[in-house]
Amino acid sequence: MKKFAFIFTIALGMLTTSCDSYLDINQDPNSPAEANMTTDIMFPAAEMNLASTYGDFYRITGGYFAQYYSHAFGTSNYVDYSQFKMSATRSSTDYTQLNQRSLKNLNTICQLAENDEEWGTFLAAKTLKAFIYQMMVDAYGEVPYSEAFDASNATPKYDQGADIYAGVLAELDEALSKASAGDKVATNFLLPGKNAGAWIQLANAVKLKMLTRESGVADVNSQIAALVSANNFPAGDVAWEGCWSNESGSLSPFYAEEFSTAWGSTQINVVANIAIVGTMQQKNAEGDVIFEDGRLAAFFEPNSSGVYTGGISGSNFSTSDNYK
């Protein structure tokens, strides 16, 4: 009996060890191990997480709230946005994507870059991090920041927007102080092949944008003046170009949402708003155009009569059929 118990104990021990070893192999073979993570691997992923949210949900809601967009005749997908409403249900997926993917990845990139003194990559990650926080604070007011990256804290506190702005600007200043124009930057899609000089310009632009938004409630005039005087900003558009194509899985986020027929839908919801059309095109009493902003034709298409006619916020009435 003792012999049997001894054998059983050995067998049980082997089984337990075997199970432990078996469970240890449950690592996604298509994902690199955490120990093998590099900034070159993580940076493009963080960018695409940002592009897919900012370029879709936040672009669309922001466009409606700013009265750039109105709703197409007879459709209802975004009528709530057109009425200046944004429910938690509608924004939950994108909000989670920014927090749990983009910001988390960018924070890890910052840590890796700082450990290796890769100050170009450090600045690039801090710049995108600042861009995201500026957008989220402007959209929600309060979001997790000071406790956001503590993995042991499942319920981080929501910081005040003013505190987040101050913290993010301080992070950006620190990164700018460490980076030099010739520093290398990890593989990325936004400014591919560029050294930190291009990212310094983008960081200055993001900083100016944040200070401008702060200027109504804080005295930041001297900081704005210093940035403007230095005049070290991007000379042209900074956009994700060359990474989209007219193929399933490679479409730009906004095009995929509104214009692609890949999902079997031909419905278009987003059209021009009368507010932006009236701002970019002025007519006299006879209806003749006396001024037209050159960007109008780049933003919108005229109706079948060659006229730009905007729709009214909060509606999807028949007038919306006259514009695009």
Describe each PLM feature range.
Residues 4, 19-70, 89, 97-100, ...:
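Membrane-proximal, proline-rich intrinsically disordered regions
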Residues 36-40, 72-324:
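Structured, solvent-exposed acidic/aromatic patches
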Residues 1, 19-21, 130, 168:
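Terminal processing/anchoring signals of secreted or surface-associated proteins
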Residues 2-9:
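Sec-dependent signal peptide recognition
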